[in-house]
Design a protein with these regions (language model features):
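N-terminal secretory signal peptides that target proteins for export/translocation
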Residues: 1-4, 97
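N-terminal targeting signals for export/organelle localization
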Residues: 2, 19-75
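C-terminal cap of thioredoxin/glutaredoxin-like
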Residues: 4-8, 24-39, 178-246
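Bacterial N-terminal signal peptides
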Residues: 8-17
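A short beta-strand-turn-helix
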Residues: 77-95, 119
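Structural alpha/beta surface segment adjacent to cysteine/selenocysteine redox centers
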Residues: 98, 109-181, 186, 211-216, ...
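Short pre-active-site segment immediately N-terminal to redox-active cysteine/selenocysteine motifs
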Residues: 101-104, 217
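The canonical Cys-X-X-Cys-His
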Residues: 105-109, 221-222
Length: 246
């Protein structure tokens, strides 16, 4: 903490951290003088505001991540072992890598290669995919079809996932159904399954988990007990996986 910040903290303490009785000991003139000192410091050194805001943001982010880690422990079974989830990689892996994604998320498209590289280079990692359609009705439609694909043939899910995520244009029901047909799935059965309780409950489960974890964007990851927000790249994700093994 800089000398300037310590001075401002001391001045603020004199104003707000004293007991009610002592606060009354300051006259109006004295309180005005203290406020003037603080104001003069801020005007003379406006960078302290940026420093304070940066520190506040760091503390808020740290608090949010700690809250998310606590939520991971509270919901670990649903996060890592739900019967409704898509599991790739090593199903008996020593570290579970969970991704919340949206088929219309540009950053998710970029992050797909990170997940694929991780599975290729680390045969001991278990990968779990959870549909998290936050970008509108089209995303919900695509996610619903994806769940129906998993229900019909989990082995074809990854091929479907890659083709739909990396395709051009908006991912919606029509495009998702076209991709499902392309990978050899029964689209008539998918149409029936879209009305099933299983599809609705799968997406509901993912949305509730994301809410509990404080996630509001994609891609978001849970790796071990840690939460990672955003397309941070293969190196950062791999580092988290290795840390989870320790």
């Amino acid at each position: 903490m800089t000398v300037l910040v310590r001075l401002l903290a001391a001045a603020a303490f004199a104003l707000i951290a004293v007991t009610p009785l002592r606060a009354q000991d300051f006259s109006t003139a004295q309180r005005g003088e203290i406020e003037k000192i603080i104001r003069d410091y801020i005007i003379a050194h406006p960078e302290v505001l940026q420093e304070a805001m940066s520190e506040l943001e760091k503390r808020q982010q740290a608090a949010e991540l700690e809250k998310a880690r606590t939520a991971v422990k509270s919901h670990s079974d649903a996060i890592f072992n739900s019967p409704r989830q898509v599991t790739l990689g090593n199903p008996q892996g020593d570290v579970t890598f969970v991704e919340f994604f949206d088929y219309n998320c540009g950053y998710c498209k970029r992050a797909l290669s990170d997940m694929m590289e991780l599975m290729k280079k680390d045969p001991k990692v278990k990968v779990v995919l959870k549909e998290f359609p936050v970008l509108g009705a089209s995303s919900v439609e695509a996610a619903q079809v994806a769940v129906a694909v998993r229900m019909q043939d989990p082995k074809k899910y990854l091929d479907f996932h890659q083709k739909l995520l990396m395709g051009r244009g908006q991912a919606d029901k029509a495009r998702a159904m076209a991709v499902a047909k392309e990978v050899g799935l029964d689209t008539a059965r998918i149409e029936r399954d879209l009305k099933s309780e299983e599809v609705a409950k799968t997406l509901e489960e993912s949305m509730k988990l994301a809410e509990a974890l404080g996630l509001n964007g994609t891609p978001s990851y849970v790796i071990g007990n840690d939460v990672v927000i955003g397309a941070v790249g293969f190196a950062a994700l791999n580092q988290k996986v290795q840390a989870a093994r320790k």
